[in-house]
Amino acid sequence: MNRRDFIKNTAIASAASVAGLSVPSSMLGAQEEDWKWDKAVCRFCGTGCGIMIARKDGKIVATKGDPAAPVNRGLNCIKGYFNAKIMYGEDRLVMPLLRMNEKGEFDKKGKFQQVSWQRAFDEMEKQFKKAYNELGVTGIGIFGSGQYTIQEGYAALKLAKAGFRTNNIDPNARHCMASAVVGFMQTFGVDEPSGCYDDIELTDTIITWGANMAEMHPILWSRVSDRKLSNLDKVKVVNLSTFSNRTSNIADIEIIFKPNTDLAIWNYIAREIVYNHPEAMDMKFIKDHCVFATGYADIGYGMRNNPNHPKFKESEKDTVEKENVITLDDEEATSLSYLGVKAGDKFEMKHQGVADKNWEISFEEFKKGLAPYTLEYTAKVAKGDDNESLEDFKKKLQELANLYIEKNRKVVSFWTMGFNQHTRGSWVNEQAYMVHFLLGKQAKPGSGAFSLTGQPSACGTAREVGTFSHRLPADMVVANPKHREISEKIWKVPAKTINPKPGSPYLNIMRDLEDGKIKFAWVQVNNPWQNTANANHWIAAAREMDNFIVVSDCYPGISAKVADLILPSAMIYEKWGAYGNAERRTQHWKQQVLPVGAAMSDTWQILEFAKRFKLKEVWKEQKVDNKLTLPSVLEEAKAMGYSEDDTLFDVLFANKEAKSFNPNDAIAKGFDNTDVKGDERKIQGSDGKEFAGYGFFVQKYLWEEYRKFGLGHGHDLADFDTYHKVRGLRWPVVNGKETQWRFNTKFDYYAKKAAPNSDFAFYGDFNKMLTNGDLIAPKDEKEHSIKNKAKIFFRPFMKAPERPSKEYPFWLATGRVLEHWHSGTMTMRVPELYRAVPEALCYMSEKDGEKLGLNQGDLVWVESRRGKVKARVDMRGRNKPPVGLVYVPWFDENVYINKVTLDATCPLSKQTDFKKCAVKIYKA
């Protein structure tokens, strides 16, 4: 057998084992011939691996890596090989479920009973309109997802913002990528990375910051490993983390730092460059393409600013008080010394409402801000492992700085949740660009700061589509009148339809439910009651008698269990869709099989719900708050040819343009399309009649309308058919050509267009009008343009609002593991993955275990000021925390760790810090 056949047969055997099949080696070829294969995308992380799917007799029977996919080149991680099995768990949701009493009436305290789609939508409509009519456009909320397909997210966004006129839609990507978004927008004026995965094969140095790539992005890590092992002497790998993990296995340097001190380490590197190695600075790059900037430090921590809120327990209040004022210790006072403060001072958070404000400063001011971050200070502040000597830690910091500084060395900095889930997450994202810009090592092949996405379409859907509470597609925002006008024209809705006031971010939707400001919430493609910090509050809020919770899901996770109505959703290969990955690569797939039971796609659910609303119910005058009332746009609608009795479905989704998309399009030949044509299941739809399809190619319509937003200004996407012929394209796609490196005029059409005689153009236009100031504040109100330039930010080191104490002596960090995805709703139902990791463990150091009298495998309580959970101790596992820190993954609903975590956020991004709170550990 030659190498080619060996690889081929190994792939088939691996795929077959996923589906529970045993295939004799002599039958591999015949078995494959009996399956129908097609290209698709992996359901899991933001890497965006291409896979091949085999279907037979109406089921997905196997998956394997796609050798033609440039991202993964035929490889899959362990989760990727189980894309088939996630679809067929024993408790897959197959019918709508409504809480009812014995009379068949909705009852908040009742038990779940199966109902028809019509009955489900009847109750959903009733409860929505009750909240909407009582509280207005702010009284309802939608928990969206970075796992929406692009079309699903676009439909949800359009229904919410053009239909219901609410901006209370926000994705779980708020939990994973919001700080990265702010970092991009504040620095570049536009979202998403300048580089691409090709940087891995071109770089000399890979530095990971709060990114356990070996487990969280394993296929990318295989490329990093290959690069390292093929060039052992030249290529260097550094892993910076708060605990030792698998990413350190091939690292030349492992740096274990105290939580939050990554801020100090970045400033140390910048200080080394500016003070001790000024020759390393790319002064031409800086002068031509950058300005220096800063913002306020006294911005709070995204907690409630009322420690006496009636829902707080007494034990929570001392942490929440820090939202308004903190007492500075020596280390924090030193970092903030430019503000004239000293240790022991009360530091009031006076600029909570303008956390994102920034202004231009001089290089001299920037240099002044960096002054405290000497090697001595930074090492003392940041050293995270008590077993390591201060001198050894200093040497590592120096080696790290030298790798960045080395003149001809290419450097890629990768990060994920360690940066983003951070009370200063936006700042630390900006700091990464700070160092790369100082050295001129950004937007170049093999060099750049690169934010890795966690979810499969956090980029493609949450960010690019704009399913955030403040956004519209293609980096537009609801607060900008021009952006609203553009959106209204594309959507063919009257002027002033879109609400100009940003809605509640993800965590605030929970808080609004608790406060009675929102009384209806719809969850799609995520599990907010498991994935949101301080969960005891939100469980209680869900069960408030006035609140009605709808959860669209494929399995009964925690969110479904606290809901009032559960809608069964089609899974990934049971529908048409598209995802966008971390390197701006957009990939499409076709529906491979029919959904299980009576499950239907989230797109279908959105469109069917839209049928329940007439224009006169939603486009009337609507009060938002005491300062804003949305005008009635019904007269303008009539002038556009609409009737006040038209439904949102008619206007937004089944309009004349939509109906022009041929349901028998050649691209769909040989494939099911339940949304377009119905299917052999003969599902009884939301009107009680057999659903026979919409009669037009709805997914193609949604795609082609959506791409209009980005054409011509740096967000260009290819047409629908093109993506079904290729293994994805990295946008902007101009004249059929994808873009590898943005902002570089050699590679980026828009950079060349913006600055034809320059090497670079940072052409994003967000927040490119600045005032001048110093480190403390802006000095005048006169704005000037920094067109085509990026910002080099100074941001100070600040500590987390809750830190270990005598009563709660441990740091707690949460995160994922290789074998499971997010809340485990899918992967915990795959027998092989469940057997591999059946429960979430409490990883801790052996020294801490000995001190507490614990043995390997003992059950302990992990308790914070907010709640406690029971977990099994692991002192010898893959994750090795230093003394004083424990790590508990969040995939296991039986180890409900978000009952323990703190709901503090980055005030700029509103992203929760899941990595830092204080706990005590004791034997159960």
Curated annotation (Swiss-Prot):
Class of the enzyme per the UniProt entry, highest EC level: oxidoreductase
Catalytic reaction(s) noted: 2 Fe(II)-[cytochrome] + nitrate + 2 H(+) = 2 Fe(III)-[cytochrome] + nitrite + H2O
Principal subcellular localization: periplasm
InterPro entries: Asp_de-COase-like_dom_sf (IPR009010), CT_Nitrate-R-NapA-like (IPR041957), MoPterin_dinucl-bd_dom (IPR006657), Mopterin_OxRdtase (IPR006656), Mopterin_OxRdtase_4Fe-4S_dom (IPR006963), MopterinOxRdtase_cofactor_BS (IPR027467), Periplasm_NO3_reductase_lsu (IPR010051), Prok_molybdopt-oxidoreductase (IPR050123)
Keyword Ion transport: no
GO biological process, one term: Mo-molybdopterin cofactor biosynthetic process
Pfam families for the chain: Molybdop_Fe4S4 (PF04879), Molybdopterin (PF00384), Molydop_binding (PF01568)
Residues making up the signal peptide according to the UniProt record: 1-30
Binding positions ([4Fe-4S] cluster): C42, C45, C49, C77
Record note on cofactor: Binds 1 [4Fe-4S] cluster. Binds 1 molybdenum-bis(molybdopterin guanine dinucleotide) (Mo-bis-MGD) cofactor per subunit.
Keywords: 4Fe-4S, Electron transport, Iron, Iron-sulfur, Metal-binding, Molybdenum, Nitrate assimilation, Oxidoreductase, Periplasm, Signal, Transport
Ranges where the 4Fe-4S Mo/W bis-MGD-type domain occurs: 35-91
EC number: 1.9.6.1
Residue sites binding substrate per the record: W890
Family: Belongs to the prokaryotic molybdopterin-containing oxidoreductase family. NasA/NapA/NarB subfamily.
Summary of subunit composition and partner proteins: Component of the periplasmic nitrate reductase NapAB complex composed of NapA and NapB.
HAMAP family the UniProt entry points to: Nitrate_reduct_NapA
Protein name per UniProt: Periplasmic nitrate reductase
Gene: napA
